[in-house]
């Protein structure tokens, strides 16, 4: 179920402040963040965010196609190593 239009998109307040200061300073730096639940807004386009995946910060460069999605969608939390093969079956 999607969020009510009356409420608007959710973005943590500190994230808006950090993005505004980074854009006004003109520096190209990665903005570290832990808020995977925040929605990507149009004013974030062109900025790079380090989205935490539980272990490290994954750099995500925001493009226009990402607007409206959540930051957590672009930083996977689980690593898939594939199913291990059965060594007994290979022998025989």
Swiss-Prot record:
* InterPro entries (UniProt xref): Ribosomal_uS19, Ribosomal_uS19_bac-type, Ribosomal_uS19_CS, Ribosomal_uS19_SF
Presence of the UniProt keyword DNA repair in the record: no
User: What is any one of the record's Gene Ontology cellular component terms?
Assistant: small ribosomal subunit
Annotated keywords: Ribonucleoprotein, Ribosomal protein, RNA-binding, rRNA-binding
The coiled-coil segments of this chain are none
Q: Which domain of life is it from?
A: Bacteria
- Give the UniProt record's GO annotations in the biological process aspect: ribosomal small subunit assembly; translation
Q: Name one GO molecular function term.
A: rRNA binding
Job of this protein: Protein S19 forms a complex with S13 that binds strongly to the 16S ribosomal RNA.
PANTHER family hit by this protein: RIBOSOMAL PROTEIN S19P FAMILY MEMBER, SMALL RIBOSOMAL SUBUNIT PROTEIN US19M
Give the family from UniProt: Belongs to the universal ribosomal protein uS19 family.
The protein's matches in NCBIfam families, at most eight in alphabetical order, are given as: rpsS_bact
Q: What is this protein called?
A: Small ribosomal subunit protein uS19
Give the organism, scientific name.
Parvibaculum lavamentivorans (strain DS-1 / DSM 13023 / NCIMB 13966)
Q: What is the lineage of its organism?
A: Bacteria, Pseudomonadati, Pseudomonadota, Alphaproteobacteria, Hyphomicrobiales
Name of the gene: rpsS
């Amino acid at each position: 179920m999607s969020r009510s239009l009356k409420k608007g998109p959710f973005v943590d307040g500190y994230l808006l402040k950090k993005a505004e200061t980074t854009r006004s300073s003109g520096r190209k730096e990665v903005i570290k963040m832990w808020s995977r639940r925040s929605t990507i807004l149009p004013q974030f386009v062109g900025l790079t965010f380090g989205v935490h995946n539980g272990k490290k910060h994954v750099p995500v460069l925001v493009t226009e196609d990402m607007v409206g999605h959540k930051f957590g969608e672009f930083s996977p939390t689980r690593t898939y190593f594939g199913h291990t093969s059965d060594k007994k079956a290979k022998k025989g």
